[in-house]
């Protein structure tokens, strides 16, 4: 942004970072505006959870709840994503290392967001973007990471190991957003 060069990132948080790190987002936004360039995020979310959902919502007379899920194979996205999703962890380790992070009060979460230390799941920013696009006012938002398992052992070339039956093969991040307008968005 300092050099006035347009940039686009596939970082999931960059899609709509206003609800996970507003301070740094404002700094980047102000710098980009000052230097006449655009800094943006893009990828899976803007098509399937952004434009598609907002287009369908725009053609609907009444909405009470938007609920949906998406899935992908962590094997296709490399070691960093596989580890961030808890692939290969026992359920006990998944709970300690992944799921426990979300067990906090709204005040604790907001403090982390304001300090720029919050680590959102891949759906957190989508819900914020969708509310912004639809003109909804967020009153609360939570996330819960749930381990996904399989009944048989699975060989993981990404992890270079065999994930045992019943251990985490990845996760589902369920993000629930309540709005002043009474519409609930639940994505995973």
Task: Please give the residue ranges for each predicted region.
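Short Asp/Glu-rich motifs
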Residues: 19-20, 51-52, 150
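Short amphipathic alpha-helical segments and helix-helix/interface helices
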Residues: 25-29, 54, 127
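Rossmann-fold NAD(P)-binding glycine/threonine-rich loop
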Residues: 2-6, 10-37
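Active-site-lining helix/loop region of Rossmann-like oxidoreductase modules
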Residues: 58-188
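General beta-strand structural signal in soluble alpha/beta enzymes
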Residues: 7-10, 39-42, 67-68, 140-141
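Short secondary-structure capping/turn micro-motifs that flank functional sites
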Residues: 16-17, 48-49, 147
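Short, ordered loop/turn segments at secondary-structure junctions
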Residues: 11-15, 44-45, 71
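Alpha-helical support elements that line or immediately flank enzyme active sites
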Residues: 47-59
């Amino acid at each position: 942004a300092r050099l006035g060069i347009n940039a686009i990132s596939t970082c999931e948080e960059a899609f709509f970072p206003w609800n996970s790190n507003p301070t740094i987002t404002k700094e980047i936004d102000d710098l980009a505006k000052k230097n006449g360039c655009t800094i943006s995020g893009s990828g899976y979310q803007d098509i399937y959870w952004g434009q598609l959902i907002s287009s369908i919502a725009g053609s609907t007379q009444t909405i009470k709840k938007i609920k949906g899920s998406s899935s992908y194979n962590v094997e296709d996205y490399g070691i960093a994503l596989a580890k961030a999703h808890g692939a290969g962890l026992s359920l006990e380790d998944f709970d300690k290392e992944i799921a426990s992070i979300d067990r906090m009060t709204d005040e604790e979460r907001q403090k982390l967001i304001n300090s720029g230390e919050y680590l959102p799941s891949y759906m957190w920013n989508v819900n914020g973007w969708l509310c912004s696009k639809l003109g909804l006012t967020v009153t609360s938002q939570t996330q819960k990471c749930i381990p996904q398992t399989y009944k048989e052992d699975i060989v993981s070339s990404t992890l270079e190991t065999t994930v045992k039956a019943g251990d985490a093969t990845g996760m589902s991040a369920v993000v629930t957003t309540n709005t002043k307008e009474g519409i609930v968005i639940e994505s995973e």
